[in-house]
Amino acid sequence: MLLILDAVGGLDYAATNQFSYDNPIRVTSNSWGSSGPFDPMNPVNIATYELYKRGIVSVFAAGNDGPGEDTHNPYAQAPWVVSVGASEKDSVLTSFSSRGKRGEMGTFTMPDGREWTYFNQPTIVANGVDIVSTRTLTGALPATAAEQDANGIAPAHLPFYSHMSGTSMATPHVAGIVALMLEANPHLNPAQVKDILERTATNLTGRLAWEAGAGHVNAYAALAEASGMRNDFGGTVNTLREFNSNALLSPGGDPVPFSILFTPVGEVEDVTFEVGPEVAWVAARATVDNTIAVVLTDPDGVQYGSAISLPAIGSTVVAGGPGKAGTWKVTVRGIGSVSGVALDPLGATNGYAAPGYVDGQVTFLNSGGYTGLDDIGGHAAEKAIEHAVAYRLVDGYSDRKFRPDQHIRRRELAQYLLMGSTIRQQLPLDGTPSFTDLDVDSPYYAYAESAVAGGAPLRDLAQDDAGVMGLYNGQFRPNDPVTRASLAYSLVQALGMQDQAVAFSGDLTVFHDGQRIPLDDAGQIPAALRGYVQLALDMGLLNARFSLTQGPFDLSPTLHARFDPTERVTRGGWSVAAGRFMTQYQVAQD
């Protein structure tokens, strides 16, 4: 009771002293909370409602009890407050950020007679990991924080500041953005502030509303909207639109652990496991201090390889693919080359890596059914399409068809990249379109503008990379098909890896069974896209095609690989690539 009264007392102070300063109090930052169900008559919620009626925005931490469902701070669920989840600096929702509850909502009436509807989900997400914040002079620091502080904070500031993580660190970021919005436009009321934050948000890859609300906060767009420079943001936000297709996935059975001994020569063991017909997606994950890749093989022999654990890519590797009933295998392989230079040109080893055990686990997502996808049953990409639809990486058409074999158009690719690749929505502040061949009234216009904007991926921390899609002689060409080479560019660019792609030199190869196989059609890949194709292959975003040839006197066949850079990507093919992209993107979550 004392804690509640103290909290309410702080909110009461803001109301009582709102006009006691040169500038009125317009926003409160609340890095505290509780647990349990939302109750509009709770004293804290009544207090924030009074602040709302006085024009004061209450910003609340969503809580640090994630990733489980229904762990959301009940004070953050009030529809008149802004609830803030936490992201990491590489733009993934952090595991500790509290989640809402899928589908939970309710209506209620406050004592003043006004009816409200609440949704058990965060409003927005902001950076909340490894943030430099004030500390008490007497509090002891964990050893890891003390070491991090010594490396990143000036000695004179060490007694007063430390690195901290939590939605408590994310909340002040949003409160500060709200303050800037109100400075730009003091006439905004709390409902308008919340609306702008949601309409200008960035969709987070593979995260739904109950987990991350509208997505990642976009301070630049929020200020542009608040100041009246634009008033039409929101066309790309997943939570603000209706989808033609829907699918529901749920966690599958218990994870299958594996511990595989890698040896550079000889047979490398594999672990087999069974997958049922209800499984929509299979993923194998390992964190290794070695140049190792994880390889999944489905019952038909189709392989799904992870990225290779390298400093430029990261130490956590994940391989994923659409579910298929039967016996699967998981194994590991070493790297066959670095930057195009073969490490084992004779193919006598399992790839280059130190011997040792690789520990990880295989996880599953089960199908819960889908709607608006009447033509995908039995298609080779059915499970991948279902997975992509469930995580808002793709959508079907209004006639309940998906058309998996139809070529994807550039306007659709722009839409799907914005839906599921953590790309900021950007619109020209001077009102002048970046191209003239797509009308500003088109539902695809905002997607296309954002796709060609520089610095749009949140992974591009310097915000200086080129757009995830390009223009052709100043035109967007929305109806053009998408080739595999151009898709490689878009996916790698969305990961913020422009510098690595541009710096690549050497032969184009694909990793297969511990070896690097040269691409027979490497000469067909434009020089500017070679590094993008190589990274897309190395990270398992796109696959190569293999074949065997054997001359009349050869003792054994020769394995060949090609990329088919000019081949047009189908909508089913995009769904597979989008699922792999999501798997790779979320590897960064600590």
Segments and roles (model prediction):
Residues 1-5, 21-26, 52-55, 77-81, ...:
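Subtilisin-like serine protease catalytic core
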Residues 1-40, 85:
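Subtilisin-like peptidase catalytic core
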Residues 1-8, 162-182:
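Active-site alpha-helical elements of protease catalytic centers
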Residues 25-29, 157-161, 183-269:
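C-terminal subdomain of the subtilisin-like protease fold in secreted/lumenal serine endopeptidases
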Residues 76-175:
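Extracellular S/T/G-rich loop segment that most often corresponds to the catalytic His/Ser-adjacent loop
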Residues 211-212, 224, 261-305:
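Acidic, Ser/Thr/Pro-rich low-complexity intrinsically disordered segments
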Residues 233, 240, 296-303, 320-374:
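C-terminal edge strands of extracellular/lumenal beta-sandwich accessory domains
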Residues 236, 361-590:
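N-terminal propeptides
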